Every structure is written in C-alpha cells, then in structure tokens.
C-alpha cells in the first residue's frame, strides 16, 4: 500500500519522494583509460548513465545524435539548402561545429546539404552590450567556407548583409522596440519577441532560397517551451513547438531541431572538448535578466532547470510528451496570421469564459448586470475573423491599434 498520502503533495508535488541522481559526473582531468576504446586519455568525460570515455569517443557519441536525428526521420533531403540560426549561445555554436564537421567529412560520411549561417542581432531590443563583431568574424574564419550573414531583429529581410560588410553603426530604424514597450507584461513581450524572431528567420530563408532552417534547441529548452506553450494558451500547437520538424513557417520553409536529443551536460562537455567560446552567457536571452518570477517563461525555465540539475531523466520525458498531444489537423483548417498555428474551429468554453470576464470588466456596471448581453459580446469577439489564435489575440489587445506584423 502506498505510504504517500494526499497531505504529502504540497507546493512541490511529489518531488520530495523522488531520488535524485547521485552518479559522479563531470570532466575528469586526471589521466585514465577510456571505457569505450581502451585508449589512455588525459581527459575523461563522464555523462549520466554512461561510462567514462575519452574525448574522441564522447564527440562521436554527441555527433551521432545530431546525424541520427536527421537520418532516422529522413527530414532533410539530399543537397537541401539549409539556413543555420546562430545567436552566440553555447547551443548554437555546438550546432555550428557539428554541421561544419559533418560537411567536411569524406564523400561517404558527408552530410549532403548547402548551409548558410545567419546571426540575428537583437542587442538594440535586448538593451545589453553591442554585438561582438570581432568574435563573430573569428567564427566566420574558423568555419570557412560557410557563408555568414547578419540581420537586425525587427528589420526586414532586405537589410540582410554579409558578415564582412556589416556595420553596427548602419542600422535601419524599426518599430519593434516601440511595440514591445506597449506590452504590459514581460510574458507578452517575450512571446511576441519569439514570434518575431521566427518570422524573420522565415523571411531570411526565403530571401536566401533556403528550404530548411536549423534551430539550436536542446532537450531542456524544448521541455520549457512545451510547458510555456500550454500556459500561454498555445496548447493546440504545442506539439509543433517541440517537434523535430516544424512546418508552420511562411513560404513552405521547414524548421528543424537536430539537437533535441542533447542535454545541457552534453552541450557543456562539447564546448569544453572543442574549445568553443560562446558569445553570450547561458540564461541571457531576452527578458531573463529580470529574474525567475518576472514572467511565465522565466519561471518555467527555472523549473525545468531545477529538474535538469536534480532529476535529469525527467526533462526528456517532459518534452517527448509533446509528440503524443498533437491535435488532429485538417487541410482546410485556417492558420494564425502571426504564428501560423492552426486556428480552433470550435468555440471553446474556456475561451468564452475569458472573453466574458473581459467584456464585463471593460463594459462596467451597466452591461455587467445583463448576463445575456455580456455573453453575446464575448461570442462576437471570439467569432470575429481577425485571423489570430488566442495567444496572439491577447498580444494584439495589448498593442491596441498597432498590428502584430
């Protein structure tokens, strides 16, 4: 009989009953024998649930995950045009290094695709230090012959420039900052920031005639994204937010996440093994400097980060749940004009209740006494063909007369 009663499930749920991982993991600097190939190595890598191994065996393991994610599902056609999104994070540099390595192998093991790299400069929106152009140019030199491009977040794809021709002083004015300032909550600003970045990637890919975009999201990022999508009212498209293949981008561009099977520990080890130098620190994305409780996204990321630290096996279970909750799609189903997610065809009771509360609050005492009138107004709002999903409509209400795009 279970000894955990209902009173045992407090604010922390049942996490107190779970046993945290106690395996000694990390980079062992002292020499030792690799348990995979038997070679004496000056540096051993010990991952969770794996034996200590040398640098070459670890790199083979990590790179195999990258190749296997693309090969098993056969989502990348031969000689496809690929755009790699680099933001300077450790994850994006790992993906860049893996892609470059896969393209410089012999003919038999080579990844047959034509890759380009784009760096989205978001420092004007982020409010931090200006982008390290010198470090970015060093990346371009290290990973030749890949072509590097730079574009500013909030600008049009027409402002795309090659890295060698880009100047931080010659930036086009854009209204993204103004729109972000109009949004009251950091949750809405981060959601809108993410959608704008994704739409810009689609525009850049279309301009460069790329059919696929590589995004450097790992398992922890996807677990946080799945939970965030559900809390923001994007549950109908949450499966696509964490899937290997996301086909919602404009102009038929497909978004791929080939690092979804890697975890934070493997990324950290890979950075050390290949001596990569990230251009930005972990946890420095837009809005994260405001603290863990400043937004739903920050709170969810902190929760998943705690899971990753204490119960690493749980994180992959969370994001893989997204593969099982995909909604039934219809060919004739309309999509959101902002995030391209499928629109709900049926009137949701939950959304109706939210709109009912909003209608009563905005109308005041007079209309709140007439329940039928309030319900009718709520239905009119939901049935209004604005081409937006629930989450994007909430952002539009905060922006007022400004358009999302």
UniProtKB/Swiss-Prot annotation:
Coiled coil region boundaries: none
Annotated source species: Drosophila pseudoobscura pseudoobscura (Fruit fly)
Record's protein name: Cytoplasmic tRNA 2-thiolation protein 2
InterPro entries per UniProt: CTU2, Rossmann-like_a/b/a_fold
Lineage, opening ranks: Eukaryota, Metazoa, Ecdysozoa, Arthropoda, Hexapoda
HAMAP family: CTU2 (MF_03054)
UniProt-annotated location(s): Cytoplasm
Family of the protein in this entry: Belongs to the CTU2/NCS2 family.
Pfam families in the cross-refs: CTU2
PANTHER family linked: CYTOPLASMIC TRNA 2-THIOLATION PROTEIN 2
Its biological purpose: Plays a central role in 2-thiolation of mcm(5)S(2)U at tRNA wobble positions of tRNA(Lys), tRNA(Glu) and tRNA(Gln). May act by forming a heterodimer with NCS6/CTU1 that ligates sulfur from thiocarboxylated URM1 onto the uridine of tRNAs at wobble position.
Functional pathway: tRNA modification; 5-methoxycarbonylmethyl-2-thiouridine-tRNA biosynthesis
Swiss-Prot/TrEMBL keywords: Cytoplasm, tRNA processing
Gene Ontology, cellular component aspect: cytosol
MF terms (GO), sorted A to Z: nucleotidyltransferase activity; sulfurtransferase activity; tRNA binding
Biological processes annotated in GO: protein urmylation; tRNA thio-modification; tRNA wobble position uridine thiolation; tRNA wobble uridine modification
